[in-house]
Amino acid sequence: MQQQYNPSAIEPKVQQFWAENKVFKAVKDVTKEKYYCLSMLPYPSGKLHMGHVRNYTIGDVVSRYQRMIGKNVLQPMGWDAFGLPAEGAAVKNNTAPAKWTYENIEYMKGQLKMLGFSYDWDREVTTCRQEYYKWEQWFFTELYKKGLVYKKTSTVNWCPNDATVLANEQVHEGCCWRCDTPVEQREIPQWFIKITDYAEELLTHLDNLPQWPDQVKTMQRNWIGRSEGVEITFKIAGSNAELPVYTTRPDTFFGVSYVAIAAAHPLAEMAAENNPALAEFIREAKNTKVAEAELATMEKKGMATGLFAIHPLTGKEVPVWVANFVLMHYGTGAVMAVPAHDERDFEFAQKYGLQINQVIQPLDGSEWDFSKAAYTEHGKLINSAEFDDLNFEQAFNAIADKLESMKVGKRQVNFRLRDWGVSRQRYWGAPIPMMTTEDGEVVTVPMQDLPVILPEDVVMNGVQSPIKADPEWAKTTYNGKPALKETDTFDTFMESSWYYARYTCPQYHEGMLDSDEANYWLPVDQYIGGIEHATMHLLYFRFFHKLLRDAGILNSDEPATKLLCQGMVLADAFYYTSPTNERIWVSPTQVTLERDEKGRIIKATDPEGRELVHSGMTKMSKSKNNGIDPQEMVEKYGADTVRLFMMFASPAEMTLEWQESGVEGAKRFLGRVWNLVYEYSQNPATAALDVAALSKAQKELRRDVHKTIAKVSDDIGRRQTFNTAIAAIMELMNKLTKAPLENEQDKAVMAEALSAVVRMLYPITPHICFELWQALGNNDTIDFAPWVVADESAMVEDEKLVVVQVNGKVRVKLPFRQQQPKMKSKQLRKRMQT
């Protein structure tokens, strides 16, 4: 053992041992309890960032701990390799997306290995490889045959100059990212998967996930958005047209003063045929893409169509308006507006001078000022014919009954969730395995012709997908007759929705999954990833698992039992203002700081001496140039130090503030551990531990060791409070460095303590512990060592201090042995007097 701790000498050697001996290879073993630990796979963007490092370090700590407690652990890694950034990078770097992607994978794989993560690399999955997406294509054709896939027209962003579809990310302030042309909204045919068929199950099964964060489950419940209401049919005056609307508040039905429809609604387009002003308004509204989250705050705009809808119960006519706050793809694309009892309807009615009819009164009978706001709470019905004086629940049922009896309405459960649009008009994705024959029939690509291979050796011009630009690529045959292949590709969420299952059998070629292997390893025992994925990836992930179950491939209901959402990594951000009033962000690694006595930054300068503005701790990002390169940190401090800081600086679910001073502190701590083991190894114990012969001080030290073992075991295993586990080990180390090594029992207690410390640190800092384990005289490697178990008897204190109070005042403090025989009152009095 070297006297000085030198991670650059230790870590590559240990990593080579792991690789050559395939130490972390996972093999199905029905005699052992399995444990599948999975971190969300990365997009191969070129370099790891600190968010990756935090995620994967948490996963590795969990995996190594679970191996030590005797479980058969699977921890794989792969690449979510399709996606839009590769197309932009290909154009910028004059290369093909495939080449750029594969080079990035190799580089990032080296970075992961440098950090010492215990992956089974034999199970590596790369989603842009045809052996992976072949089975995704096959499964899509099976879903189509089951009626779970369909094609319909849907709205996309269209650049008229480039004549191409743009992803939302390619639209900057309403214009094309490439040519700055105003973007239009266009209707084109797209493929959808019926996730709505599973909406109820996706909602109710959230109750079966007690180890998922409540915040994620709440976000999914809101996204699925189950509501109970009534669909009501209005007739259009002077025509045979009908207008269905859905409402969760039938109790307000008598307060309807207008009906609002989406710009894309067929009635709107019909009304605009002879109304140029309305046609222009509709065109403008269609081309203004509005996120649902913005609907509440955006300016409400509308225009009367000239049409009137007939109220089914009163027979009165109410005007039909086109409104920009109604979206065609939500509900029926039309809403009954009750301005007196809905804030959005109220705002619109006030702007355009529409009627406000009160039909709900507060339950306490108080008056409401409708000149200021709508009354949106439940209450008692007024101005509602025979339904007056009913409360919400009574009115809901009574009005629904009446509408159903008249056959102009029906009770209905609605979901906010929409079917999953999986078509992308991009190149770098898996081709959708559908064809259109020369007579217009849409058919699936037969199994024997799968995969539909995406050509990788292409030239990107930044305008159109190479497979759309090449008419020859689409040409094929079906039953000996000419046909055309679909040129859209899959949404990349498709690949990331089932990769976790493919890890269980990545070399299986007889089908999508080997059910025996998949059902042994699944569900995932611990999934780790950011909460930003709550309503997209994590929902599709659950949906796909249910599809695989219903296809008879899997036998579980949910893909992951436990979910941990790690917090973001923050770093200081600094900038100066250029002569053109532009903020120029300077990397924290280039900044010289002055701090006050409390450690607060009081001055920051860049290498040119410019004084910088400190904008605080913000999420690491390219835009603020405050990302810290993990590779630089590993080269400077060592992988174990970076891992230790990541696990110690903050609870796993909370944001982590990157402080290089904290990294330096982590390095110093590991140096202290190394030094103590080195000191012990120069004069190790030669006698076995004799508990009966221990002195009081030796027993106290041993008690501290085993109390720490118990705490760390609980913190890492059950509570997953890794930072408090590390704090406990640090506290123990403070005591161990002060402990004497004067006799054989001192050394024996120290030997036991150091063996425990090294094993407790191993999941977090595996390289240094690999070396220290051998320095302590162990012949096997620590990778196969069992977790240290606390000795209950060692934690029992010999004496307890008993405080005796009389009339609330402390009279005496008496030390009592744990096995103290019962005392008579006379003996107790005597002790109190001495």
UniProtKB/Swiss-Prot annotation:
One function term, GO molecular function aspect: ATP binding
Reactions the enzyme catalyzes: tRNA(Leu) + L-leucine + ATP = L-leucyl-tRNA(Leu) + AMP + diphosphate
EC assignment: 6.1.1.4
UniProt-annotated binding residues for ATP: 622
Class in the EC hierarchy, top level: ligase
Keyword annotations: Aminoacyl-tRNA synthetase, ATP-binding, Cytoplasm, Ligase, Nucleotide-binding, Protein biosynthesis
A GO biological process held by the record: leucyl-tRNA aminoacylation
A GO CC term assigned to this protein in UniProt: cytosol
Motif ('HIGH' region): 42-52
Domain of life: Bacteria
Motif, 'KMSKS' region: chain positions: 619-623
InterPro entries named among the record's database cross-references: aa-tRNA-synth_I_CS (IPR001412), aa-tRNA-synth_Ia (IPR002300), Leu-tRNA-ligase (IPR002302), Leu_tRNA-synth_edit (IPR025709), M/V/L/I-tRNA-synth_anticd-bd (IPR013155), Methionyl/Leucyl_tRNA_Synth (IPR015413), Rossmann-like_a/b/a_fold (IPR014729), tRNAsynth_Ia_anticodon-bd (IPR009080)
Main localisation: cytoplasm
UniProt subcellular location: Cytoplasm
Family per record: Belongs to the class-I aminoacyl-tRNA synthetase family.
Name of this protein: Leucine--tRNA ligase
